[in-house]
């Protein structure tokens, strides 16, 4: 795909109100890609004006999420940049100035209604079937200014023309028409000087030179307000593109009641950031060549925003696990898997007896055996306990296999003991020779050994597993099971 003719400036603007959300990662991926494709800039702005919902460590965790995903912004509160500050709470003076500028130009007005008066006005408007009418809208400019100068509490509201319509042009949709009579006069600046989302969002996007506003489709209903603000200021509108929301399997909006929504949960489960990005890239978009597995560089090479579809992509955890397993088996080298797996286990304070690092021969042997059977790193210890401890459980199915083949175990133990070399090829050859000699099928010979040494019938290739465990450990377990 040829590079866009002009650099795109994109942004994400999360609010630090809780766990770093998978939806932020999703929107961040597409904004990051659009900027990188064009040699533009990707901005991370923190919208922290809602102090009631503010969570102190949330901002730090958002940065950590973006770093983990390798979606590094060019400008943010961490890096700084030419258009900072990048926290809205540090830009309050700007918003007040711009709100008053709109009052002076006649596109906004001071409003003095109390909360009780507003409640009554809303009830009246609801009964009449129209938007709330604000009496202060009809005050003369001098009269309103005099009340402000006298210290009377006031908000600043957008003055929406009651005639005509406002059209939102969205790159992913046909033009969306909103009747102006159905758009209420939104508060832009609160009485305490705090801006609302609408004012701060538009002012920041303009001052940070954002060219493309790519965000979730839940913001479509706010966009006519933003369009009206751009027009009131005399500023050109950015390109708007509202991405489809991530959905649960029942097509409801993704929520933590049905799917984990915190990216930290996926990190703690041992998902790979590359697999997460690959999966998120397929949410509403398909590779033009039908590829399912591709890296961030390939996504940047072929992605076109116009190709996003709006069908409501399903965030399928089983599919994400499938992607992660594919990366473990087909994309990363075994060295890389071992290194990352060892780091994951150390981070989670898992003790591996006698393992001194990711290159430890025994750890590497176990990793080699388990890669085909892993989807996420968190599964590793549950699936490999018998490699690390003699105190491993024997499940019901395995116990039945031991009981059914108990008379074979002493002879098999003796033959394993007498093998000249204890490697997978020799072990496999011994099993076949024993089965042929006794007139048994391999399905009778191998299960009791597997059950005895692993406590489960779900384990890797048996000869390779026995070689990794070593002769001494295998014989002790088989002899114990035979008693």
From Swiss-Prot:
It is found in: Cytoplasm. Its EC number is 6.1.1.17. Pfam families: Anticodon_2, tRNA-synt_1c. ATP binds at residue 256. Belongs to the class-I aminoacyl-tRNA synthetase family. Glutamate--tRNA ligase type 1 subfamily. It catalyses: tRNA(Glu) + L-glutamate + ATP = L-glutamyl-tRNA(Glu) + AMP + diphosphate. Catalyzes the attachment of glutamate to tRNA(Glu) in a two-step reaction: glutamate is first activated by ATP to form Glu-AMP and then transferred to the acceptor end of tRNA(Glu). PROSITE patterns: AA_TRNA_LIGASE_I (PS00178). It comes from Deinococcus radiodurans (strain ATCC 13939 / DSM 20539 / JCM 16871 / CCUG 27074 / LMG 4051 / NBRC 15346 / NCIMB 9279 / VKM B-1422 / R1). A motif ('KMSKS' region) lies at residues 253-257. GO terms for biological process: glutamyl-tRNA aminoacylation. This is Glutamate--tRNA ligase. Monomer. GO terms for cellular component: cytosol. The gene is gltX. It comes from the Bacteria. One of its GO terms (molecular function) is tRNA binding.
């Amino acid at each position: 795909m040829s590079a866009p003719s002009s650099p795109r400036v994109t942004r994400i603007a999360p609010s630090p109100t809780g766990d770093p959300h998978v939806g932020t990662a999703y929107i961040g991926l597409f904004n990051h890609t659009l900027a990188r494709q064009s040699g533009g800039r990707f901005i991370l702005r923190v919208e922290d004006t809602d102090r009631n919902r503010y969570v102190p460590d949330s901002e730090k965790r958002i940065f950590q999420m973006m770093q983990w995903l390798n979606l590094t912004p060019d400008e943010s509160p961490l890096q700084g940049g030419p258009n900072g500050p990048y926290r809205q709470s540090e830009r309050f003076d700007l918003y007040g100035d711009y709100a008053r500028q709109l009052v002076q130009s006649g596109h906004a007005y001071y409003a003095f209604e109390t909360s009780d008066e507003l409640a009554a006005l809303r009830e009246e408007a609801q009964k009449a079937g129209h938007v709330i009418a604000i009496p202060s809208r009809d005050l003369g400019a001098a009269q309103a200014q005099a009340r402000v100068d006298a210290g009377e509490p006031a908000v600043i509201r957008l003055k929406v023309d009651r005639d005509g319509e406002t059209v939102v042009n969205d790159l992913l949709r046909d033009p969306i028409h909103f009747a102006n009579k159905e758009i209420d006069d939104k508060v832009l600046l609160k009485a305490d000087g705090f801006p609302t989302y609408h004012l701060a969002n538009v002012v920041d996007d303009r001052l940070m030179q954002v060219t493309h506003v790519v965000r979730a489709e839940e913001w479509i209903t706010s966009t006519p307000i933003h369009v009206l603000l751009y027009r009131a200021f005399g500023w050109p509108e950015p390109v708007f593109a509202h991405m489809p929301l991530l959905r649960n399997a029942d097509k409801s909006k993704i929520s933590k009641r049905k799917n984990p929504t915190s990216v930290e949960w996926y990190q703690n489960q041992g998902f790979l950031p590359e697999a997460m990005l690959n999966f998120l890239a397929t949410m509403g978009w398909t590779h033009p060549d039908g590829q399912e597995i591709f890296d961030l560089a390939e996504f940047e090479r072929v992605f076109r925003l116009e190709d996003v579809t709006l069908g409501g992509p399903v965030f399928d955890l089983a599919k994400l696990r499938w992607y992660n397993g594919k990366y473990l088996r087909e994309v990363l080298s075994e060295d890389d898997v071992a290194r990352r797996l060892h780091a994951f286990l150390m981070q989670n304070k898992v003790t591996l007896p006698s393992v001194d690092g990711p290159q430890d021969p025994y750890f590497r042997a176990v990793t080699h055996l388990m890669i085909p059977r892993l989807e996420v790193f968190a599964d590793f210890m549950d699936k490999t306990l018998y490699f690390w401890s003699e105190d491993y459980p024997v499940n019901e199915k395995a116990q039945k296999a031991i009981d059914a083949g108990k008379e074979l175990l002493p002879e098999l133990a003796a033959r394993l003991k007498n093998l000249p070399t204890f490697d997978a090829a020799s072990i496999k050859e011994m099993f076949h020779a024993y089965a042929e000699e006794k007139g048994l099928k391999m399905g009778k010979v191998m299960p009791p050994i597997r059950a005895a040494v692993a406590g489960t019938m779900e384990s890797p290739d048996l000869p390779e597993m026995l070689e990794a465990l070593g002769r001494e450990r295998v014989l002790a377990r088989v002899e114990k099971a035979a008693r």
